[in-house]
Amino acid sequence: MALIFFLVSSLRAQSLEIEDATDQKNLVGINYSTWHSLAFRKNIPIRNIQEILSGGGQFGPRASWHFWAEPAVGYYRGDNAMVMDYHFDLFEQAQIDFIILDATNLFPDSKKKDEYLYEPFEVMVKLMRNREEAGKQSPRIIIWSPGLLANELHARYFSKSEYKDIWFYLDEGKGAKPIFLSRLDIDKIPNQVNRQLTVRAMWGLNTNLADREWSFLENYPQPVAMFDGKPEQLVVCTALQKNYMTNEDLATPRKGGKTFQLQWSRAFEIRPKFVIITWWNELMAQRQKDAPNGQVQFTDMFRPEYSRDIEPVQSPYGDMYFRLMRDYIKAYKKGESMPTNLLELHRKESDRLDFDMDGISNLIEGTKDSDGDGISDQWDLDSDNDGIPDSREK
């Protein structure tokens, strides 16, 4: 595949078809992260929790970034168009309708908004247009942020016509508008912005959902978000925590895929308008204050069983969770009963001809890492590891 496809935006700026969810059913989306550039700093090593627990290195200081696993394509920055394209190919195979861009840690005064969200977002928009021109499908976008950031997002994106085709729309009776997800500070969204969007609050671990409130994290049986007397949204998780994933006595692990299976059974039972899967590629977490007993603490991930990403990883799962997701979605969208034999099928060797269980297409496989930053050359946008993307250097 030509590098120019990934690195140069189309001059024709191919528009996408507007996607309106109003009259559709059995829609499936997934939470998606673009914050990975925050972990790449000059002279700061990539920290992998699995390797550290196996005796390979030490935990970093409080607030330092740690990956729970190495992605199958190797470590990558959040603005890497080639990796996004690889993800979108997988989403097309799995029939993912929309992705939810996680900006929940960003506020108007956040100093890293560009690196965390805005730069990856612009890369993603260009990629979607290139894919459209090439005849490839892309999921539409829903942004999820604090309500306090809604005004800035509206001024920057929602109010501009050049972005109107990338959103996922929903009509509540006053015309189809882009869906926007707020944290629980939904009251901080200015009225003039609220009127231009279809707004839902979304947070987790709340068994009693308020009006227009969705959830991204729940134990089975997951609560159902209702709207106009009908089931509107339900979350499906691979694993989840009560407070910290490192608190394994209270967290719910993957259980070799059984947690994912159980949560999907709830979706097949309820069949809401929207199923949201948690998560695709959060991948990393900051070290928190140690527990009173000295236990290192991470909020959203720790050992493989106490993590929740579906993106293919080097070890130990390969692309197993992607295959499970793909086949659950296939049956769900066809209106079939839930398949009960997937765990037995997919614990075996991958059935995907372009994967060898490391999650990398045979066409793009490669391991050379010239600058030793943990990112293989084919995905590396900062080839001298100085913290400045090559595209910005003279």
Language-model region placement:
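Bacterial N-terminal signal peptides
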Residues: 1-10
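Glycan-processing catalytic domains of CAZymes
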Residues: 14-351, 357
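Extracellular calcium-associated, cysteine-rich motifs in secreted modular proteins
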Residues: 339-394
